[in-house]
């Protein structure tokens, strides 16, 4: 039972690390804010037009 518990803890740690790494490298910005796909600043909604987020609802 102990080896299975260690494996579960290891998998949980790996999952947490990947989750925080993904959030740290990718950011969502709102309407009118600066966006740039090269540095991973994407618009939450709409498209990045001339480095500004434009909402398309």
Curated annotation (Swiss-Prot):
GO CC term (a single one): extracellular region
Keyword Aminoacyl-tRNA synthetase set for record: no
Keyword S-adenosyl-L-methionine listed: no
Cellular compartments annotated: Secreted
Family: Belongs to the asilidin-1 family.
Domain notes: The presence of a 'disulfide through disulfide knot' structurally defines this protein as a knottin.
Signal peptide (UniProt feature, chain positions): 1-24
Summary of the tissues where the protein is detected: Expressed by the venom gland. Exclusively expressed in the venom thoracic glands (and not in body tissues).
Organism: Machimus arthriticus
Chief location category: secreted
Record-given protein name: U-Asilidin(1)-Mar2a
Keywords, sorted A to Z: Disulfide bond, Knottin, Neurotoxin, Secreted, Signal, Toxin
Disulphide linkage map: 28-44, 35-48, 43-53
Its biological purpose: May act as a neurotoxin.
